Protein backbone atom coordinates (compact mmCIF):
# COMPACT_ATOMS: atom_id res chain seq x y z
CA UNK A 1 0.00 0.00 0.00
CA UNK A 2 1.35 3.44 -0.96
CA UNK A 3 1.60 6.55 1.20
CA UNK A 4 -1.92 7.80 2.03
CA UNK A 5 -2.69 11.52 2.32
CA UNK A 6 -6.16 12.77 3.29
CA UNK A 7 -7.67 9.50 2.08
CA UNK A 8 -5.80 9.45 -1.26
CA UNK A 9 -2.96 7.09 -2.17
CA UNK A 10 0.00 8.91 -3.74
CA UNK A 11 1.42 7.60 -7.02
CA UNK A 12 5.10 6.61 -7.29
CA UNK A 13 6.23 10.04 -8.55
CA UNK A 14 4.46 11.83 -5.70
CA UNK A 15 5.85 9.38 -3.12
CA UNK A 16 9.39 9.90 -4.35
CA UNK A 17 9.02 13.65 -3.77
CA UNK A 18 7.51 13.23 -0.31
CA UNK A 19 10.41 11.01 0.87
CA UNK A 20 13.22 13.01 -0.80
CA UNK A 21 15.61 14.74 1.60
CA UNK A 22 17.51 17.03 -0.79
CA UNK A 23 18.73 20.40 0.45
CA UNK A 24 17.05 22.21 -2.46
CA UNK A 25 14.32 20.40 -4.39
CA UNK A 26 12.49 21.62 -7.50
CA UNK A 27 9.25 19.76 -8.23
CA UNK A 28 8.05 20.20 -11.81
CA UNK A 29 4.33 19.40 -11.67
CA UNK A 30 2.20 19.29 -14.81
CA UNK A 31 -1.34 20.66 -15.04
CA UNK A 32 -3.81 18.52 -13.08
CA UNK A 33 -1.07 16.33 -11.57
CA UNK A 34 -2.07 16.60 -7.90
CA UNK A 35 0.67 18.95 -6.69
CA UNK A 36 -1.35 20.25 -3.71
CA UNK A 37 -1.80 16.69 -2.45
CA UNK A 38 1.96 16.19 -2.83
CA UNK A 39 2.68 19.34 -0.79
CA UNK A 40 0.34 18.16 1.99
CA UNK A 41 2.00 14.73 1.88
CA UNK A 42 5.45 16.33 2.19
CA UNK A 43 4.45 18.36 5.24
CA UNK A 44 2.80 15.33 6.85
CA UNK A 45 6.02 13.34 6.28
CA UNK A 46 8.21 16.12 7.74
CA UNK A 47 6.06 16.33 10.89
CA UNK A 48 5.19 12.65 11.43
CA UNK A 49 8.36 10.90 10.23
CA UNK A 50 11.14 13.51 10.44
CA UNK A 51 9.71 14.92 13.70
CA UNK A 52 10.08 18.53 12.58
CA UNK A 53 8.09 20.92 14.76
CA UNK A 54 5.23 22.42 12.66
CA UNK A 55 6.30 25.86 13.93
CA UNK A 56 9.59 25.41 12.06
CA UNK A 57 7.94 24.88 8.66
CA UNK A 58 7.13 27.80 6.35
CA UNK A 59 4.77 27.26 3.43
CA UNK A 60 4.27 30.04 0.87
CA UNK A 61 1.53 30.32 -1.71
CA UNK A 62 0.57 33.24 -3.93
CA UNK A 63 -3.00 34.16 -2.97
CA UNK A 64 -4.98 34.46 0.24
CA UNK A 65 -7.46 32.00 -1.23
CA UNK A 66 -4.80 29.32 -1.80
CA UNK A 67 -3.16 29.84 1.61
CA UNK A 68 -6.52 29.53 3.39
CA UNK A 69 -7.34 26.37 1.42
CA UNK A 70 -3.96 24.84 2.29
CA UNK A 71 -4.37 25.68 6.00
CA UNK A 72 -7.73 23.91 6.08
CA UNK A 73 -6.37 20.81 4.35
CA UNK A 74 -3.30 20.63 6.60
CA UNK A 75 -4.99 21.09 9.97
CA UNK A 76 -1.58 21.88 11.52
CA UNK A 77 -0.13 24.96 13.21
CA UNK A 78 2.16 25.81 10.29
CA UNK A 79 3.04 29.25 8.92
CA UNK A 80 1.15 29.26 5.62
CA UNK A 81 1.28 32.71 4.07
CA UNK A 82 1.74 34.81 0.96
CA UNK A 83 5.05 36.55 0.24
CA UNK A 84 3.49 39.86 1.27
CA UNK A 85 2.30 38.47 4.61
CA UNK A 86 5.78 36.99 5.14
CA UNK A 87 7.43 40.37 4.52
CA UNK A 88 5.01 42.14 6.87
CA UNK A 89 5.60 39.56 9.62
CA UNK A 90 9.40 39.94 9.31
CA UNK A 91 9.16 43.73 9.54
CA UNK A 92 6.69 43.67 12.46
CA UNK A 93 8.89 41.20 14.39
CA UNK A 94 11.63 43.81 14.11
CA UNK A 95 9.32 46.72 15.07
CA UNK A 96 9.39 48.20 11.58
CA UNK A 97 6.11 49.57 10.26
CA UNK A 98 5.11 51.11 6.92
CA UNK A 99 1.95 52.28 5.24
CA UNK A 100 1.54 50.07 2.19
CA UNK A 101 -0.29 51.22 -0.92
CA UNK A 102 -3.00 49.13 -2.59
CA UNK A 103 -1.87 46.48 -5.07
CA UNK A 104 -3.40 48.41 -7.99
CA UNK A 105 -1.88 51.79 -7.11
CA UNK A 106 0.66 51.64 -9.93
CA UNK A 107 -2.13 50.87 -12.42
CA UNK A 108 -4.04 53.87 -11.05
CA UNK A 109 -1.05 56.21 -11.49
CA UNK A 110 -0.40 54.95 -15.04
CA UNK A 111 -4.06 55.47 -15.95
CA UNK A 112 -4.03 58.97 -14.45
CA UNK A 113 -0.84 59.74 -16.37
CA UNK A 114 -2.56 59.13 -19.70
CA UNK A 115 -5.92 60.63 -18.71
CA UNK A 116 -5.11 63.58 -16.47
CA UNK A 117 -1.59 64.13 -15.13
CA UNK A 118 -0.21 64.61 -18.62
CA UNK A 119 -2.53 67.55 -19.40
CA UNK A 120 -0.64 70.82 -19.32
CA UNK A 121 2.70 69.15 -20.09
CA UNK A 122 2.98 69.75 -23.82
CA UNK A 123 6.35 68.07 -24.26
CA UNK A 124 5.14 64.85 -22.64
CA UNK A 125 1.93 64.90 -24.69
CA UNK A 126 4.02 65.35 -27.86
CA UNK A 127 6.19 62.44 -26.77
CA UNK A 128 3.17 60.15 -26.34
CA UNK A 129 1.63 61.25 -29.65
CA UNK A 130 4.97 60.62 -31.39
CA UNK A 131 5.06 57.13 -29.90
CA UNK A 132 1.75 56.47 -31.64
CA UNK A 133 3.11 57.99 -34.88
CA UNK A 134 1.14 61.25 -34.67
CA UNK A 135 3.27 64.28 -35.53
CA UNK A 136 0.84 67.19 -35.95
CA UNK A 137 1.09 69.34 -32.85
CA UNK A 138 -1.26 72.28 -33.47
CA UNK A 139 -3.31 72.62 -30.26
CA UNK A 140 -1.50 69.69 -28.67
CA UNK A 141 -3.82 69.15 -25.71
CA UNK A 142 -6.96 69.09 -27.86
CA UNK A 143 -5.28 66.70 -30.32
CA UNK A 144 -4.12 64.46 -27.49
CA UNK A 145 -7.55 64.28 -25.82
CA UNK A 146 -9.19 63.43 -29.14
CA UNK A 147 -6.64 60.68 -29.76
CA UNK A 148 -7.19 59.11 -26.31
CA UNK A 149 -10.96 59.26 -26.71
CA UNK A 150 -10.91 57.58 -30.15
CA UNK A 151 -8.35 54.91 -29.19
CA UNK A 152 -9.49 54.06 -25.67
CA UNK A 153 -9.12 50.28 -26.01
CA UNK A 154 -5.59 50.56 -27.41
CA UNK A 155 -4.56 53.08 -24.76
CA UNK A 156 -5.89 50.71 -22.09
CA UNK A 157 -3.61 47.92 -23.40
CA UNK A 158 -0.62 50.27 -23.47
CA UNK A 159 -1.37 51.31 -19.89
CA UNK A 160 -0.96 47.64 -18.96
CA UNK A 161 2.30 47.54 -20.92
CA UNK A 162 3.81 50.53 -19.08
CA UNK A 163 2.62 49.15 -15.73
CA UNK A 164 4.25 45.84 -16.57
CA UNK A 165 7.53 47.56 -17.53
CA UNK A 166 7.73 49.49 -14.25
CA UNK A 167 6.67 46.44 -12.24
CA UNK A 168 9.44 44.37 -13.85
CA UNK A 169 11.91 47.21 -13.28
CA UNK A 170 11.23 47.13 -9.54
CA UNK A 171 10.81 43.38 -9.04
CA UNK A 172 14.09 42.70 -10.84
CA UNK A 173 15.86 45.14 -8.52
CA UNK A 174 16.62 47.77 -11.16
CA UNK A 175 16.70 51.47 -10.25
CA UNK A 176 16.42 54.95 -11.72
CA UNK A 177 20.03 54.72 -12.91
CA UNK A 178 19.08 51.69 -15.01
CA UNK A 179 17.25 53.92 -17.49
CA UNK A 180 20.62 55.39 -18.53
CA UNK A 181 21.99 51.91 -19.23
CA UNK A 182 18.83 50.90 -21.10
CA UNK A 183 19.12 53.89 -23.44
CA UNK A 184 22.63 52.84 -24.39
CA UNK A 185 21.29 49.47 -25.57
CA UNK A 186 18.49 50.64 -27.87
CA UNK A 187 18.60 52.65 -31.07
CA UNK A 188 15.09 52.60 -32.55
CA UNK A 189 13.05 55.79 -32.20
CA UNK A 190 9.91 54.09 -30.89
CA UNK A 191 11.76 52.14 -28.19
CA UNK A 192 13.60 55.26 -27.03
CA UNK A 193 10.27 57.10 -26.83
CA UNK A 194 8.84 54.21 -24.79
CA UNK A 195 11.72 54.51 -22.33
CA UNK A 196 11.24 58.27 -22.02
CA UNK A 197 7.52 57.86 -21.31
CA UNK A 198 8.23 55.03 -18.83
CA UNK A 199 10.81 57.20 -17.04
CA UNK A 200 8.26 60.00 -16.61
CA UNK A 201 5.68 57.57 -15.24
CA UNK A 202 8.25 55.97 -12.91
CA UNK A 203 9.27 59.36 -11.47
CA UNK A 204 5.64 60.40 -10.96
CA UNK A 205 4.84 57.05 -9.30
CA UNK A 206 7.79 57.24 -6.89
CA UNK A 207 6.96 60.87 -6.04
CA UNK A 208 3.31 59.94 -5.40
CA UNK A 209 4.39 57.19 -3.01
CA UNK A 210 6.76 59.53 -1.19
CA UNK A 211 4.30 62.41 -0.90
CA UNK A 212 1.61 60.07 0.49
CA UNK A 213 4.03 58.38 2.92
CA UNK A 214 3.56 55.00 1.26
CA UNK A 215 5.66 52.10 0.01
CA UNK A 216 4.50 49.46 -2.45
CA UNK A 217 4.65 45.67 -2.08
CA UNK A 218 7.95 45.44 -3.95
CA UNK A 219 9.58 48.02 -1.65
CA UNK A 220 8.25 46.04 1.31
CA UNK A 221 9.85 42.79 0.07
CA UNK A 222 13.18 44.61 -0.32
CA UNK A 223 12.86 46.16 3.17
CA UNK A 224 12.20 42.72 4.69
CA UNK A 225 15.22 41.24 2.94
CA UNK A 226 17.45 44.16 4.01
CA UNK A 227 16.23 43.75 7.60
CA UNK A 228 17.42 40.13 7.62
CA UNK A 229 20.74 41.01 5.97
CA UNK A 230 21.32 43.68 8.62
CA UNK A 231 20.94 41.18 11.46
CA UNK A 232 17.22 41.45 12.13
CA UNK A 233 15.20 38.68 13.79
CA UNK A 234 13.85 35.84 11.65
CA UNK A 235 12.05 32.71 12.87
CA UNK A 236 14.31 29.63 12.78
CA UNK A 237 12.66 27.73 9.97
CA UNK A 238 14.00 24.26 9.13
CA UNK A 239 11.96 23.69 5.99
CA UNK A 240 10.50 26.09 3.41
CA UNK A 241 7.94 25.03 0.80
CA UNK A 242 6.86 27.36 -2.01
CA UNK A 243 3.88 26.62 -4.25
CA UNK A 244 3.53 28.11 -7.77
CA UNK A 245 7.24 28.87 -7.83
CA UNK A 246 7.12 29.66 -11.55
CA UNK A 247 5.44 32.94 -10.53
CA UNK A 248 8.24 34.07 -8.19
CA UNK A 249 9.99 37.37 -8.84
CA UNK A 250 13.70 38.07 -8.43
CA UNK A 251 13.29 40.20 -5.29
CA UNK A 252 11.12 37.48 -3.72
CA UNK A 253 13.93 35.03 -4.44
CA UNK A 254 16.36 37.42 -2.72
CA UNK A 255 14.10 37.44 0.35
CA UNK A 256 13.93 33.62 0.48
CA UNK A 257 17.69 33.35 -0.09
CA UNK A 258 18.34 35.68 2.86
CA UNK A 259 16.13 33.49 5.10
CA UNK A 260 17.91 30.30 3.99
CA UNK A 261 21.34 31.88 4.54
CA UNK A 262 20.30 32.87 8.07
CA UNK A 263 18.49 29.65 9.10
CA UNK A 264 20.11 26.95 6.92
CA UNK A 265 16.61 25.74 6.05
CA UNK A 266 15.94 23.14 3.37
CA UNK A 267 13.67 24.22 0.55
CA UNK A 268 11.19 22.53 -1.78
CA UNK A 269 9.55 24.55 -4.54
CA UNK A 270 6.67 23.30 -6.67
CA UNK A 271 5.35 24.62 -9.96
CA UNK A 272 4.99 24.30 -13.71
CA UNK A 273 7.03 26.45 -16.08
CA UNK A 274 4.40 25.73 -18.76
CA UNK A 275 2.02 27.83 -16.64
CA UNK A 276 4.28 30.82 -15.99
CA UNK A 277 1.83 33.53 -17.10
CA UNK A 278 2.26 36.39 -14.64
CA UNK A 279 5.21 38.29 -16.02
CA UNK A 280 3.14 41.48 -15.69
CA UNK A 281 3.38 41.03 -11.90
CA UNK A 282 7.16 40.67 -12.09
CA UNK A 283 7.60 36.89 -12.08
CA UNK A 284 10.89 35.57 -13.49
CA UNK A 285 10.70 32.16 -15.17
CA UNK A 286 14.51 31.91 -15.13
CA UNK A 287 14.37 31.19 -11.38
CA UNK A 288 12.41 28.05 -12.22
CA UNK A 289 14.08 26.70 -15.36
CA UNK A 290 17.58 27.45 -14.04
CA UNK A 291 16.86 26.49 -10.43
CA UNK A 292 20.34 25.03 -9.88
CA UNK A 293 21.88 28.43 -10.63
CA UNK A 294 20.07 30.01 -7.66
CA UNK A 295 20.03 27.24 -5.02
CA UNK A 296 22.93 25.02 -3.93
CA UNK A 297 22.83 21.20 -3.77
CA UNK A 298 19.73 21.20 -5.97
CA UNK A 299 17.71 18.34 -7.40
CA UNK A 300 14.82 18.20 -9.88
CA UNK A 301 11.92 15.73 -9.70
CA UNK A 302 8.86 15.66 -11.95
CA UNK A 303 5.20 14.71 -11.59
CA UNK A 304 4.21 13.76 -15.13
CA UNK A 305 0.95 11.89 -14.51
CA UNK A 306 -2.07 14.13 -15.05
CA UNK A 307 -5.55 13.31 -13.77
CA UNK A 308 -7.52 16.06 -15.57
CA UNK A 309 -6.82 15.97 -19.31
CA UNK A 310 -6.89 13.20 -21.89
CA UNK A 311 -3.60 11.86 -23.25
CA UNK A 312 -4.43 13.35 -26.66
CA UNK A 313 -4.97 16.83 -25.25
CA UNK A 314 -2.02 16.89 -22.85
CA UNK A 315 0.28 15.57 -25.59
CA UNK A 316 -0.88 18.24 -28.05
CA UNK A 317 -0.72 21.06 -25.50
CA UNK A 318 2.68 19.89 -24.20
CA UNK A 319 4.30 19.70 -27.63
CA UNK A 320 2.79 23.09 -28.47
CA UNK A 321 4.34 24.86 -25.47
CA UNK A 322 7.67 22.97 -25.78
CA UNK A 323 8.22 24.55 -29.21
CA UNK A 324 9.98 27.08 -27.01
CA UNK A 325 13.28 25.36 -26.14
CA UNK A 326 13.50 27.43 -22.94
CA UNK A 327 10.75 25.30 -21.35
CA UNK A 328 11.68 22.24 -19.29
CA UNK A 329 11.03 19.07 -21.31
CA UNK A 330 8.29 16.82 -19.94
CA UNK A 331 6.56 13.64 -21.00
CA UNK A 332 3.08 14.17 -19.58
CA UNK A 333 0.85 11.09 -19.43
CA UNK A 334 -2.80 10.36 -18.72
CA UNK A 335 -4.95 7.24 -18.59
CA UNK A 336 -7.89 9.19 -20.05
CA UNK A 337 -8.63 8.94 -23.79
CA UNK A 338 -10.43 11.43 -26.05
CA UNK A 339 -9.72 11.07 -29.77
CA UNK A 340 -10.41 14.70 -30.81
CA UNK A 341 -10.44 16.90 -27.68
CA UNK A 342 -9.72 20.19 -29.50
CA UNK A 343 -12.61 21.68 -31.47
CA UNK A 344 -11.88 24.63 -33.76
CA UNK A 345 -15.19 26.45 -34.16
CA UNK A 346 -15.57 28.71 -37.20
CA UNK A 347 -18.09 31.44 -36.44
CA UNK A 348 -19.16 33.74 -33.62
CA UNK A 349 -22.49 32.16 -32.66
CA UNK A 350 -21.83 31.50 -28.98
CA UNK A 351 -25.55 30.89 -28.43
CA UNK A 352 -25.59 27.96 -30.85
CA UNK A 353 -22.39 26.51 -29.38
CA UNK A 354 -23.81 26.61 -25.84
CA UNK A 355 -26.84 24.69 -27.12
CA UNK A 356 -24.84 21.82 -28.62
CA UNK A 357 -22.34 21.13 -25.80
CA UNK A 358 -23.36 18.57 -23.19
CA UNK A 359 -22.16 18.95 -19.62
CA UNK A 360 -20.84 21.88 -17.61
CA UNK A 361 -19.03 24.67 -19.46
CA UNK A 362 -16.47 27.31 -18.48
CA UNK A 363 -15.97 30.24 -20.87
CA UNK A 364 -12.53 31.85 -21.19
CA UNK A 365 -11.29 35.04 -22.84
CA UNK A 366 -7.83 36.41 -23.48
CA UNK A 367 -8.92 40.02 -22.89
CA UNK A 368 -11.63 41.35 -20.58
CA UNK A 369 -13.49 42.97 -23.46
CA UNK A 370 -13.60 39.83 -25.66
CA UNK A 371 -17.02 38.84 -24.34
CA UNK A 372 -18.80 41.98 -25.59
CA UNK A 373 -19.22 40.93 -29.21
CA UNK A 374 -20.95 37.67 -28.23
CA UNK A 375 -23.65 39.23 -26.05
CA UNK A 376 -27.26 39.68 -27.16
CA UNK A 377 -30.76 39.66 -25.68
CA UNK A 378 -30.40 35.93 -24.90
CA UNK A 379 -26.83 36.01 -23.53
CA UNK A 380 -26.00 38.38 -20.67
CA UNK A 381 -22.78 38.84 -18.69
CA UNK A 382 -22.21 40.11 -15.16
CA UNK A 383 -19.67 39.44 -12.40
CA UNK A 384 -17.78 36.63 -14.17
CA UNK A 385 -20.96 34.82 -15.15
CA UNK A 386 -22.84 34.36 -18.41
CA UNK A 387 -26.56 33.69 -18.28
CA UNK A 388 -28.21 31.87 -21.17
CA UNK A 389 -31.73 30.48 -20.98
CA UNK A 390 -31.99 28.98 -17.49
CA UNK A 391 -28.28 28.19 -17.23
CA UNK A 392 -25.35 30.05 -15.71
CA UNK A 393 -21.75 29.61 -16.90
CA UNK A 394 -18.58 30.87 -15.24
CA UNK A 395 -16.65 33.24 -17.51
CA UNK A 396 -13.07 34.31 -16.76
CA UNK A 397 -9.97 35.68 -18.38
CA UNK A 398 -7.44 32.90 -18.98
CA UNK A 399 -5.23 34.42 -16.27
CA UNK A 400 -8.08 34.19 -13.77
CA UNK A 401 -8.83 30.58 -14.76
CA UNK A 402 -5.44 29.19 -13.73
CA UNK A 403 -5.96 26.37 -11.25
CA UNK A 404 -9.59 25.88 -12.28
CA UNK A 405 -11.13 23.09 -14.35
CA UNK A 406 -14.45 22.21 -15.97
CA UNK A 407 -16.04 19.43 -18.05
CA UNK A 408 -15.84 21.56 -21.21
CA UNK A 409 -14.18 24.87 -22.01
CA UNK A 410 -14.91 27.52 -24.65
CA UNK A 411 -12.14 30.01 -25.52
CA UNK A 412 -13.42 33.18 -27.19
CA UNK A 413 -11.89 35.32 -29.94
CA UNK A 414 -8.93 33.10 -30.90
CA UNK A 415 -8.12 35.26 -33.93
CA UNK A 416 -5.17 36.95 -35.60
CA UNK A 417 -5.58 40.50 -34.35
CA UNK A 418 -3.81 43.11 -32.27
CA UNK A 419 -6.21 42.19 -29.44
CA UNK A 420 -6.59 38.52 -30.40
CA UNK A 421 -4.87 35.44 -29.04
CA UNK A 422 -1.93 35.97 -28.94
CA UNK A 423 -2.36 39.57 -27.83
CA UNK A 424 0.25 41.38 -29.93
CA UNK A 425 0.57 44.48 -27.76
CA UNK A 426 1.44 42.63 -24.56
CA UNK A 427 4.28 40.69 -26.19
CA UNK A 428 6.48 43.75 -26.73
CA UNK A 429 10.21 43.09 -27.12
CA UNK A 430 11.15 46.13 -25.04
CA UNK A 431 10.18 44.10 -21.95
CA UNK A 432 13.45 42.21 -22.41
CA UNK A 433 15.27 45.27 -21.05
CA UNK A 434 13.78 44.76 -17.59
CA UNK A 435 13.71 40.96 -17.60
CA UNK A 436 16.53 38.82 -16.23
CA UNK A 437 15.18 35.81 -18.08
CA UNK A 438 16.77 34.64 -21.34
CA UNK A 439 13.39 33.48 -22.63
CA UNK A 440 13.29 35.44 -25.90
CA UNK A 441 11.02 33.15 -27.91
CA UNK A 442 8.33 35.10 -29.79
CA UNK A 443 5.02 35.18 -27.90
CA UNK A 444 6.51 32.89 -25.23
CA UNK A 445 4.19 33.99 -22.44
CA UNK A 446 1.18 34.13 -24.76
CA UNK A 447 2.05 30.56 -25.77
CA UNK A 448 2.04 29.49 -22.12
CA UNK A 449 -1.24 31.32 -21.59
CA UNK A 450 -2.76 29.41 -24.51
CA UNK A 451 -1.50 26.18 -22.91
CA UNK A 452 -3.34 27.13 -19.70
CA UNK A 453 -6.52 27.75 -21.72
CA UNK A 454 -6.25 24.35 -23.44
CA UNK A 455 -5.68 22.42 -20.21
CA UNK A 456 -8.62 23.72 -18.13
CA UNK A 457 -10.92 21.09 -19.66
CA UNK A 458 -11.62 17.55 -18.48
CA UNK A 459 -13.17 16.69 -21.86
CA UNK A 460 -13.18 19.08 -24.83
CA UNK A 461 -11.92 22.60 -25.49
CA UNK A 462 -13.71 24.72 -28.12
CA UNK A 463 -11.69 27.50 -29.78
CA UNK A 464 -14.10 30.11 -31.17
CA UNK A 465 -12.50 31.78 -34.19
CA UNK A 466 -12.96 33.37 -37.62
CA UNK A 467 -11.86 31.12 -40.50
CA UNK A 468 -10.60 34.21 -42.36
CA UNK A 469 -8.55 35.41 -39.37
CA UNK A 470 -7.13 32.24 -37.80
CA UNK A 471 -4.80 32.90 -34.88
CA UNK A 472 -1.21 31.82 -35.52
CA UNK A 473 -1.73 29.38 -32.64
CA UNK A 474 -4.70 27.74 -34.37
CA UNK A 475 -2.75 27.49 -37.63
CA UNK A 476 0.06 25.78 -35.74
CA UNK A 477 -2.30 23.29 -34.08
CA UNK A 478 -3.87 22.38 -37.44
CA UNK A 479 -0.45 21.99 -39.06
CA UNK A 480 1.21 19.94 -36.32
CA UNK A 481 -1.62 18.10 -34.52
CA UNK A 482 -4.42 17.67 -37.04
CA UNK A 483 -5.16 14.10 -35.86
CA UNK A 484 -6.53 15.37 -32.55
CA UNK A 485 -8.52 18.32 -33.93
CA UNK A 486 -12.08 18.58 -35.19
CA UNK A 487 -13.24 21.63 -37.16
CA UNK A 488 -16.85 22.76 -36.63
CA UNK A 489 -18.82 25.36 -38.61
CA UNK A 490 -21.67 27.10 -36.80
What is the role of each PLM region?
Residues 79-82, 216, 224, 391-399:
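Conserved two-lobed SF2 helicase motor
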Residues 2-19, 23-28, 187-286, 305, ...:
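Conserved helicase NTPase motor core
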Residues 250-340, 484:
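Conserved RecA-like helicase ATPase core segment
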Residues 1-100, 455:
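P-loop NTPase Walker
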Residues 26-27, 33-39, 297-299, 305-390, ...:
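Helicase P-loop NTPase motor core
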Residues 56, 61-153, 397:
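Conserved P-loop NTPase-based nucleic-acid remodeling module centered on helicase motor cores
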Residues 107-208:
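Coupling/switch/interface segments within P-loop NTPase motor domains and analogous charged loops
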Residues 401-467, 475-476, 484:
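Conserved helicase C-terminal RecA-like lobe
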Amino acid sequence: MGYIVNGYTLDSEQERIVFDNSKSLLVVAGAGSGKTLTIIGKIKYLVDECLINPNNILCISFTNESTNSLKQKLGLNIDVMTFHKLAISILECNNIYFNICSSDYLDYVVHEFFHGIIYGYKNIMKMVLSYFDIFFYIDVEKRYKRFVSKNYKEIMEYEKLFSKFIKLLKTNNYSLKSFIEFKKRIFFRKERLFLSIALNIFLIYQNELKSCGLIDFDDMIIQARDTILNGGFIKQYKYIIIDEFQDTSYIRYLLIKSIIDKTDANIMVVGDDFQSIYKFTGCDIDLFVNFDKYFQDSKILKIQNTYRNSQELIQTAGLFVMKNDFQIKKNLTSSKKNFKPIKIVNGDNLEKLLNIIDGNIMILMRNNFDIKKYLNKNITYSHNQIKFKNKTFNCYTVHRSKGLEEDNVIVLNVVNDKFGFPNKIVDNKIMRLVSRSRDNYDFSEERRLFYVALTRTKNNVYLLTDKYKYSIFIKELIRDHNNYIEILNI
